[in-house]
C-alpha cells in the first residue's frame, strides 16, 4: 500500500477527508469518480493450484495456470454489440466463459465452432469470446479486440488456444491447441461431476 493509498483511506486533513468523501459519494453514480478511488491492493486472489476442479491440456509454457485468477487486462471493444469495454473482467459474467484466441475466426475449425455453439445452449452454458488483435474477427461469438496482444501474452496463448473460466473468474481448463471433444469432460470436472 502506498502513502497515497493510506492518505485516501485515512485522510489526515479536513480537506483530504472532504475530497475522499466526495469521491466515494460520486463513485456510486459516476464512472469518472470510480477512477479516483484509491483502495490500493488490499487483497490478492487465491490460486487454487492442484484443484480437482481444474484441467490442463496440451501443456503450456507460462500463462495463467488452471485454478489461477483471470487477470484484468485491457480490451478495446466488444464488436458484437459495439460497446466499449475497458477491461476483460468487465465482460465476464456469472457463468462459465470461454476465451478462444484467434487471428481470425476463419482460422477456427468448423467442428470447433459447432462444439462451442452447442455448448452455449447446454444446460450449463459456456459463453465463448473470440480474442483477436483486430476488430470484426468474430461473427459467431462476441469478439474482443486485444490490439496490443497484451491478453494473448498474459495467457501465453496462440491462435487456437482456449481458456475455460469458472463463474468465479478462475481458470477451469486451458488448451494450447483446443480439442472440442475435451470441453465437456473439463466442464463436468469444473462442476465437480464425474466425466460421462
Annotate the PLM regions.
Residues 1-196:
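Helical substrate-recognition/capping region of FAD-dependent monooxygenase/halogenase enzymes
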Amino acid at each position: 500500500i502506498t502513502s497515497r493509498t493510506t492518505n485516501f483511506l485515512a485522510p489526515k486533513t479536513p480537506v483530504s477527508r472532504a475530497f475522499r468523501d466526495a469521491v466515494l459519494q460520486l463513485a456510486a453514480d459516476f464512472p469518472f469518480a470510480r477512477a479516483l478511488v484509491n483502495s490500493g491492493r488490499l487483497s490478492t486472489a487465491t490460486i487454487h493450484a492442484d484443484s480437482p476442479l481444474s484441467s490442463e491440456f496440451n501443456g503450456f509454457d507460462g500463462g495463467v495456470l488452471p485454478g489461477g485468477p483471470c487477470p484484468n487486462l485491457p480490451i478495446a471493444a466488444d464488436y458484437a454489440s459495439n460497446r466499449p469495454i475497458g477491461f476483460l473482467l468487465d465482460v465476464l459474467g456469472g457463468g462459465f466463459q470461454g476465451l478462444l484466441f484467434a487471428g481470425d475466426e476463419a482460422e477456427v475449425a468448423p467442428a470447433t465452432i459447432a462444439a462451442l455453439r452447442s455448448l452455449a445452449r447446454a444446460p450449463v452454458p459456456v459463453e465463448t469470446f473470440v480474442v483477436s488483435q483486430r476488430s470484426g474477427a468474430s461473427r459467431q461469438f462476441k469478439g474482443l479486440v486485444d490490439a496490443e496482444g497484451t491478453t494473448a501474452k498474459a495467457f501465453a496463448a496462440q491462435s487456437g488456444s482456449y481458456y475455460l473460466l469458472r463463474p468465479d473468474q478462475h481458470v477451469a481448463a486451458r488448451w494450447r491447441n483446443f480439442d472440442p471433444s475435451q470441453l465437456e469432460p473439463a466442464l463436468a470436472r469444473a462442476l465437480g461431476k464425474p466425466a460421462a
